[in-house]
Amino acid sequence: LYVAFIAYTPPEKIRTSLSKRDNLNDDDWVAIDLDLFGDESLIYGIGANPSGVQIDGRSGFRFDTSLDLIFDVKTSTTDYGYIVEFAIPFSSLRYSVGKNQDWRVNFKRGYTTDDELVHHVVWASQIQGIECQSCQMAFLNGIEPPKQEADNIEYIPSLVAGYSEDFNNDSTSDNIEPSLFIKYPVSSVDLLEIAINPDFSQIESDDIKNDVNTVNALHFREKRPFFSEGAELFKFHSERGYINLFYSRTINDPSVAVKYTGKIGKTSYGVIS
């Protein structure tokens, strides 16, 4: 799926930076929202700033950036603004199988200097008390996505080795921990993921939180890829945001983990063990 934005603005007003992924709070940016099932069960948000820094996640009551998709971005600056081009593999997306599909879509652009957010679809009806923004999205008609093939299996092996030496006792020890992550698209909708002896030590560290004299247990955002895919199935909306049915951070050091997510009609399901 190819998407391109031509953003018109005086070059001297462009605000952009090279930062870590999903951190575009102080930059200009463009993005696309994709509701591939047309029922608001999963809305992808994919964007970038003029420097090519990516942002992606699940759109909804709040934008959840724990989901990291694989896609390419190419940017360029012109004398009339900037251009951002996206190349999004269908293998990175979950969608229904069939011809002549209608996907819901919205295009967005953020202006940092003017503190503005521009949508292709204007939410005028929200002023009238209609809170459902995603169900008012525009349509891409006649989409014929390819069927997910079994040879699109993704393997991510890793090996962590450690060596220590105790000079006081004149002893040494070493440790080798292999691990393997398998992502198997059973179909365009169903996804099987297997993690064998997963190593989460390379995941970005958590933000520091105050745990002194707190009434409730601290809640940390899930950053591990195995648990972020399909995370929307284990939470539901409330008036104050998301309510988690399952807090995956309580799973600390599994030997083997298996997850299967899919969709039948308008019913989404997920099983994790």
Residue ranges and their predicted role:
Residues 1-273:
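Structural preference for beta-rich elements and adjacent junctions enriched in aromatics
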